[in-house]
Amino acid sequence: MSRRNAAVKRPVLPDPQFNSRLASMMISRLMKHGKKSTAQKILSDAFSLISERTGGNAVELFETAVKNATPLVEVRARRVGGATYQVPMEVRQERGTAMALRWLVTFSRGRNGKSMSQKLAGELMDAANETGSAVKKREDTHKMAEANKAFAHYRY
């Protein structure tokens, strides 16, 4: 293991357009090949589609969607005496948010639709209504943790 100091965690600055740290994190997750302006346009278009369809504030709906997709527990593999157990562990808030954003982007890309902004808008609206693939993934993660509760004492 490295003896050097741990890297300092840089603070995430809020996105200038939406004044939201979550939006800034989402842009980073959407970005491919360093094309940040394209990712910003995708998020901006998705937010305008959401506002158009719901008539509400898109940023608030986005924050609700992320909250609904954020897992509270996860299972991690732990090897004990030749056997590998799925050990349920609590998820730190930062990691939970990162997982939710990653799932939202992944399942948006897998959706049927014309443009990425339309697919992202659809996934965000579904997640805000507690439906959609990202929320299903969270529920599956929670079910796995519940099923493996017996191995919780192997926590590290």
Curated annotation (Swiss-Prot):
GO biological process per UniProt: translation
Q: What's in the GO CC field?
A: small ribosomal subunit
Q: Which GO terms describe its molecular function?
A: rRNA binding; structural constituent of ribosome; tRNA binding
Q: Which UniProt keywords apply?
A: Ribonucleoprotein, Ribosomal protein, RNA-binding, rRNA-binding, tRNA-binding
Provide an example Pfam family for this protein: Ribosomal_S7
Fetch the SUPFAM superfamilies from UniProt. Ribosomal protein S7
InterPro entries, per database record: Ribosomal_uS7, Ribosomal_uS7_bac/org-type, Ribosomal_uS7_CS, Ribosomal_uS7_dom, Ribosomal_uS7_dom_sf
PROSITE patterns, from UniProt? RIBOSOMAL_S7 (PS00052)
CDD domains with a match to the protein in the record: uS7_Bacteria (cd14869)
Question: Can the keyword Transmembrane be found in this entry's annotation?
Answer: no
Known PANTHER family for this protein? RIBOSOMAL PROTEIN S7
UniProt cross-references to NCBIfam families, sorted A to Z: rpsG_bact (TIGR01029)
Its annotated function is as follows:
One of the primary rRNA binding proteins, it binds directly to 16S rRNA where it nucleates assembly of the head domain of the 30S subunit. Is located at the subunit interface close to the decoding center, probably blocks exit of the E-site tRNA.
Q: Which family does it belong to?
A: Belongs to the universal ribosomal protein uS7 family.
Q: How does it assemble?
A: Part of the 30S ribosomal subunit. Contacts proteins S9 and S11.
From the Swiss-Prot or TrEMBL record, give the protein name.
Answer: Small ribosomal subunit protein uS7
Give the taxonomic lineage as stored in the record: Bacteria, Bacillati, Cyanobacteriota, Cyanophyceae, Synechococcales
